[in-house]
Amino acid sequence: MASRKPNPDQLGLLLSQEPAAKRARRILCGVDEAGRGPLAGPVTAAAVVLNPRKPIKGLADSKILTARKREALYDEIVEKALAWHVAEATVEEIDRINILHATMLAMQRAVQGVAALGTLPDLVQVDGNRCPQVAFAVEAIVKGDALVPAISAASILAKVTRDRQLAALHIEFPLYGFDVHAGYGTPQHLAAIDLHGVTPHHRRSFAPVRRALEGMSAISIETVAAGSAWDD
């Protein structure tokens, strides 16, 4: 069961009243996600507790880093962090409970994964304006991926992991360009859906995919009707 969480103003006051030495010893867990907007693939979340004795240079919002830089930082984060865990919510879960709740679920799983390793955060800091239900104090930080190093690290782990998943998906479905757009609704991706249809990895609750399915159903009905007329 999640503990009662103070509101952001209360939390900021509590933190400001703590002695500096105590704040320095706090175990802070950064959390971020990747893949809320795409039409295909899971939504991925990561939780990271950095080691203050092993600083990592160059941490930043994963979206402004090159793929090469993200990959290099991924390896360094995994090596130096006190604890980290990457989790996801599947396409089926996204379609069943919606993308917002699925994102919160993935974040919750990521934090639980860190705790399962024996690292219990004093504070979980989440990018954005919403917090998952976790058994620790938690705060949301808008643009946290650019402001809080642990959240930056989490954003990098989440994005690199998801990009690798979509690159692997491209091998299975090479006609869709998943290795290029990572499932986002680019013109190339939308054209591929129109031409080749929807895969099991597409989010049927998302409007462009839903419209494509409805169009395919209409074509099927017309084809059956035309066949019946021909038989008559």
Swiss-Prot record:
This is Ribonuclease HII. Residues 26-218 form the RNase H type-2 domain. One of its GO terms (molecular function) is RNA binding. It catalyses: Endonucleolytic cleavage to 5'-phosphomonoester. InterPro entries: RNase_HII (IPR022898), RNase_HII/HIII (IPR001352), RNase_HII/HIII_dom (IPR024567), RNaseH-like_sf (IPR012337), RNaseH_sf (IPR036397). It is an enzyme of class 3 (hydrolase). Its cofactor is Mn(2+); Mg(2+). GO terms for cellular component: cytoplasm; ribonuclease H2 complex. A divalent metal cation binds at D32, E33, D127. Manganese or magnesium. Binds 1 divalent metal ion per monomer in the absence of substrate. May bind a second metal ion after substrate binding. Endonuclease that specifically degrades the RNA of RNA-DNA hybrids. It comes from Ralstonia pickettii (strain 12J).
